[in-house]
Amino acid sequence: MTEQKNTNENDLQNGTSKADDDIRYQEVKPVNNKRSGLIGSAVAILVILAIGGGLYYYTTQQATKLRDPDHLLSDNENPGITCALIPTDVKGVEIGHRHFPLNVPFMNGPTRGKDVFVPIDFIIGGPKMAGQGWRMLVECLSVGRGITLPSNSTGGLKSAAMATGATLEF
């Protein structure tokens, strides 16, 4: 797991992988997840066939409802939501243009994937973390909200103070 962490940190820093921080879609709500992954073996390695197809993602296709009907990974036939870091050069991954709202660069953009073969080693935390995706996503969401909500409130307060001529000292 340490090797995966070191490799993924380097890939995230140089832009060859994208971190999973959101599972929003254009028309599909997270509770109605249409993506699924099927564990199978191809060329003697375990892979996940991520079946997507034309959905709009803010990050690469990484959260998928995993199925293992042949019990290649474990005794559990339906491990559940699983997160993986997928390099941007994997066949089947199409990266769109970055968002540019209000002329401010925003690092998220549309990414599409269809019939993407994902090695089992791409699962965040390794194969033992298959099915732990919902917990990971909720933990990441809570950390992000813990940062953005107070900072947005502080920014709003400063803007209001500036507009009304009030002075604030922090």
From Swiss-Prot:
Residues 1-17 have a biased composition (Polar residues). The keyword Ribonucleoprotein does not apply. GO terms for molecular function: oxidoreductase activity, acting on the CH-CH group of donors. Residues 1-24 are annotated as: Disordered. Coiled coil: none annotated. It comes from the Bacteria. It is a single-pass membrane protein. One of its GO terms (cellular component) is plasma membrane. Keywords: Cell membrane, Membrane, Transmembrane, Transmembrane helix. Its main location: membrane. It is found in: Cell membrane. InterPro entries: Acyl-CoA_Oxase/DH_mid-dom_sf (IPR046373), AcylCoA_DH/oxidase_NM_dom_sf (IPR009100). This is Protein HemX. It comes from Proteus mirabilis. The gene is hemX.
